[in-house]
Structure formats: C-alpha cells, structure tokens
Amino acid sequence: MILNKEKIKNYAAYLYIKVAYDQAHSKMAHTVYFTNFYRSSKPLFLDEEDPINPCFQTISMGGGYVSGEIYRSDFEINDDARCIITTQSSAKAYKTVDGKTSEQHTNITLGKNSILEYISDNVIVYEDGKFAQFNNFKMDSSATLIYTECFGPGWSPHGSAYQYEKMYLNTKIYYDDKLVLFDNLKFQPRKNDESAFGIMDGYHYCGTMIVINQQVIEDDVIKIRDLVKEKYPDMDMIFGVSRMDIPGLGLRVLANTYYHVEKINAVAHDYFRRKLFNKKPLILRKP
C-alpha cells in the first residue's frame, strides 16, 4: 500500500505502482502515485497479441542521483495480475560533495499467479560517486519473476574506469516468506583492485538476470548456456548460468559495454518468454 504522507517526506522522490486483475472486464487495473522527481508513463501495450499486459516506464525527472538523496519505489502485483516495468533510461549517480551515499530502495510484492517482467536499465556511477541500491522482492511460489539489472562506471575526465568511490547492490528475494536469494555486491575501487581476476576480470559492466517460475528446470540452464555460446561465439564477455534452490535460475554477465550485457540478457529473456508465456520477444521501443 502507499506510504503515508509523513513517511513519504523522508524520500527525495517516491513512486508507487499497483496492478490488479479486473476479472469483470478481463483487463489489468492500475494505481500509480508519485512525488517530486519520479514519474511513470501511462500503461503501454507493446504486443498486439497480448493487449491486456501493460508496460510502465519509470521516469526520473532530475537527471540523476545527487549525493545523500534517498529514493523509494513500491510495486504491488496482485493475484493473477501481470505487467512489465522498465526504466526509461539508465540511472546516473554523480559526484558526492559531502561524503554521503545516494540510495535507491525498491520493494516489490508478487501475489498468487502474478507475473512481473522488471527490466531495468544500467546504473552508471560517475567519478567520486557513491551509490547504494536495495531491492526487496516478496513473491508467492506460484508467481513468475523475470528481473534484470546492470551497473558500470561513468565517464571520467582522466579517461580511466573505476573512478567512483562506492557501488553497492543488495537484492533479496523472499519466496513464500523464505529468503531464497541474497545477492550482495560491493565495489570500492579505491580500496580494492576491482579489475582483478575473480572480481571483474578487467571488464567494466556487471549484469544480472533472475528468472523464477515453477517450470524452470536444470535443462533450461544448459539451454541458455548453449544459446548464448551459439549466438555470440566471438563476443568479448564472460557469463555464467546457475540454477537456484527453488525453480529458477540466475545469469551473470561481465562485459565492457552495457550493450553486450543487454544482448546476453535478451537471449535468456526471449527464451523464457517463449517457454513460459508462448510470447514473442519483448521490444521496449526506447529512444
């Protein structure tokens, strides 16, 4: 539910989206609320063969995160509802001038038999920037989640990467109230050599995809590996695919451009849209 006004005041911007299945009219009803720099597009319908699956583009009007600002998003996908949520463009965290860390908190709830495709663009942290992202998912075991994220260093006048102070990504997924995934990535290039073997292996961008659905099996892990190798045999990147303890898998990509990460994630996304929904690849039509 929407935060009360007093709690909303604690955030530089707040965004709330709720999607519910309207059985009487066979469509998805939605509620959108936002403050300050946050906006959301009206529901877009990207697939003419799937006219009741809305897509919401989240928009940050301020241009980026300024040091010390805290943003919050709450998304609720009710029982039997489905939607696509995506960012309009990459998020940018700029130089901190007072040592404070910019933060993004996102809380997502998925009800019974709900479906969420949450496709976020990359987070770019610029020189001297400090940024932390906290994602908390609470989902029913009958729900479906497809989620992507990526981060990388921003432009530096020195022409070198890893000039930011801190990048922290914290993702938790609760499955029937049980914590099944705790992904904790912390990068502090001024304290550690982030380009070293075993960390980023010399690459600049790190991308992640999570797919959770009752139909995901071990054979899907093998198929995703084979599809990526077959489609991009010469791409300069490293990737890995692992099955989770629940019906789901994780895909991690290290590459030198967000474009390459996006391409690898798209291979898996297209595969699961066909297998799980019998739908064609998703085209977000971003400028």
From Swiss-Prot:
GO MF term set: nickel cation binding
Superkingdom per UniProt: Bacteria
Localization terms from the record: Cytoplasm
Record flagged with keyword Cytoplasm: yes
The keyword Cytoplasm is annotated on this UniProt entry: yes
GO cellular component: cytoplasm
Any Pfam family matching the protein: UreD
InterPro entries listed in its UniProt record: UreD
Sorted UniProt keywords: Chaperone, Cytoplasm, Nickel insertion
Major localisation: cytoplasm
Known function: Required for maturation of urease via the functional incorporation of the urease nickel metallocenter.
Family: Belongs to the UreD family.
Oligomer and partners: UreD, UreF and UreG form a complex that acts as a GTP-hydrolysis-dependent molecular chaperone, activating the urease apoprotein by helping to assemble the nickel containing metallocenter of UreC. The UreE protein probably delivers the nickel.
Stated name of the protein: Urease accessory protein UreD
Record organism: Ureaplasma parvum serovar 3 (strain ATCC 700970)
